[in-house]
UniProtKB/Swiss-Prot annotation:
<keyword id="KW-0963">Cytoplasm</keyword>
<dbReference type="InterPro" id="IPR028989">
    <property type="entry name" value="RimP_N"/>
</dbReference>
<keyword id="KW-0690">Ribosome biogenesis</keyword>
<dbReference type="InterPro" id="IPR028998">
    <property type="entry name" value="RimP_C"/>
</dbReference>
<dbReference type="GO" id="GO:0006412">
    <property type="term" value="P:translation"/>
</dbReference>
<dbReference type="InterPro" id="IPR003728">
    <property type="entry name" value="Ribosome_maturation_RimP"/>
</dbReference>
<protein>
    <recommendedName>
        <fullName>Ribosome maturation factor RimP</fullName>
    </recommendedName>
</protein>
<comment type="similarity">
    <text>Belongs to the RimP family.</text>
</comment>
<dbReference type="Pfam" id="PF17384">
    <property type="entry name" value="DUF150_C"/>
</dbReference>
<dbReference type="GO" id="GO:0000028">
    <property type="term" value="P:ribosomal small subunit assembly"/>
</dbReference>
<comment type="function">
    <text>Required for maturation of 30S ribosomal subunits.</text>
</comment>
<dbReference type="Pfam" id="PF02576">
    <property type="entry name" value="RimP_N"/>
</dbReference>
<dbReference type="InterPro" id="IPR035956">
    <property type="entry name" value="RimP_N_sf"/>
</dbReference>
<dbReference type="GO" id="GO:0005829">
    <property type="term" value="C:cytosol"/>
</dbReference>
Length: 155
């Protein structure tokens, strides 16, 4: 079986000096290798082809046959690494907490320990007839959530 760490090192070599970042590498028991990369401005097919060829040049099919798939992390897919949070700051995201609560808001900040989302909620001021929309910042530790993903809007 092909070692995931070997593939990760090869991808890291290719990424040096580029604005792309590695999201995930998986290697199945039947040697299907899946590499996911991302970029602040999107992933171009030409770069996926270039990375695929680079990986193929470093692995020996004669020694061990494999299937290789290189692509983008995919819009609307849950974030897997901090860089994905960072490139989506200022954009709408959907969060599902481990308690099963789903929230939508604007990603405000992210760091190694947690991230902050600004949500809008209705609050009825005392004596008012109608509730008003107010913004609230909520900070989550990564282990408090099941997923965070970019919210695709067709407005």
């Amino acid at each position: 079986m092909i070692d995931k760490n070997v593939v990760t090192r090869i991808v890291d070599e290719w990424l040096e000096g580029k604005d792309y970042f590695l999201v995930d590498v998986t290697v199945s028991p039947d040697d299907k290798i899946v590499v996911e990369i991302d970029h602040a401005e999107g992933v171009w097919i030409d770069d996926c082809v270039e990375l695929s060829r680079y990986i193929e040049s470093k692995l020996d099919r004669e020694e061990e046959d494999y299937e290789l798939e290189v692509g983008s992390a995919g819009i609307g897919q849950p974030f897997k690494v901090l860089q994905q949070y960072l490139i989506h700051i200022g954009k709408e995201v959907e969060i599902l907490t481990k308690e099963g609560k789903k929230l939508e808001g604007v990603l405000k900040d992210a760091n190694e320990e947690n991230f902050t989302v600004t949500i809008e909620k209705k609050v009825k001021p005392e004596g008012a007839k109608r509730p008003k929309l107010v913004e609230e910042d909520i900070t989550f530790a990564y282990d408090e959530i099941k997923y965070t993903k970019y919210l695709i809007s067709f407005k």
